[in-house]
Design a protein with these regions (language model features):
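Pre-Walker A adenine-sensing motif
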Residues: 1-7
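Pre-Walker A (Motif I) flank of P-loop NTPase domains
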Residues: 7-14, 74-76
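The conserved Walker
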Residues: 19-20
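Conserved glycine(s) of the Walker
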Residues: 23
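Conserved substrate/cofactor phosphate-moiety recognition/catalytic segment
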Residues: 26-76
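Glycine-rich phosphate-binding loop used to anchor ATP phosphates in small-molecule kinases
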Residues: 56-110, 143, 147, 151, ...
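A glycine- and Lys/Arg-enriched "phosphate-lid" helix/loop adjacent to the NTP-binding pocket
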Residues: 101-150
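NTP-dependent small-molecule kinase module
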Residues: 149-198
Length: 198
């Protein structure tokens, strides 16, 4: 095949998701070495000066969505980080897939909101950004519910990892759109389904 006869490689969108404190930013560095375009609302918020934290978060959310829309229009590969606590990405994911993107979801799970709160507190003591405890707890539950009810059904591939041990994440389960679920950790997977799918 000549270069012009070769099939076009579809653009890729990778979503690194999980509760606050789950290690999304840390894992992103290892997982996304090939992605030049990595969009992170927390990093955008840190760059916004002259605003309250709430004002910076709102501005960062707007800029985050603008950046990913620009990249999608340009059909560039990109990766983003999110808690999945809202359904704000759902329509975009459907549109990206309609536009020829392959969308991959990696979810970093923690077994409790308490652990998420502890990890964020540790991050703050180490100089990282803070998130109010009530927000961490709300996002923890909402993100897991949305993972199962909204996001797994609309992406091309997905993987859920246990990232509670502080070392390498442990694969719990994975799948492809409309395909079978491959379960690596049956007890953890069963617990997630019972808690967030019923």
């Amino acid at each position: 095949l000549s270069e012009q006869d070769a099939p076009e490689v579809p653009p890729q969108a990778v979503i690194i998701a999980g509760p606050n404190g789950s290690g999304k930013s840390t894992c992103s560095v290892a997982l996304l070495t090939q992605f030049v375009e990595f969009v992170n609302a927390d990093l955008i918020a840190q760059e916004i000066t002259g605003h309250t934290r709430a004002g910076a978060d709102i501005g960062a959310g707007r800029l985050f969505l603008e950046q990913i829309e620009r990249l999608a229009r340009q059909r560039r590969d990109f990766a983003i980080e999110t808690t999945l606590a809202t359904r704000s990405l759902a329509d975009r994911i459907v549109q990206w897939r309609r536009d020829g993107y392959r969308v991959h979801l990696v979810f970093l799970w923690l077994p409790s909101a308490d652990l998420a709160v502890q990890r964020v507190a540790f991050r703050v003591r180490s100089g990282g950004h803070s998130v109010p405890e009530s927000t961490i707890r709300r996002r923890f539950t909402a993100g897991l519910r949305n993972l199962f009810r909204i996001y797994i059904p609309i992406v091309d591939t997905w993987r859920v990892y246990d990232n509670s041990r502080g070392a390498d994440p442990v694969l719990i389960a994975s799948g492809v759109k409309d395909g079978p679920v491959k379960i690596a950790e049956p007890d953890a997977w069963r617990g997630l389904l019972q808690e967030y799918c019923s």
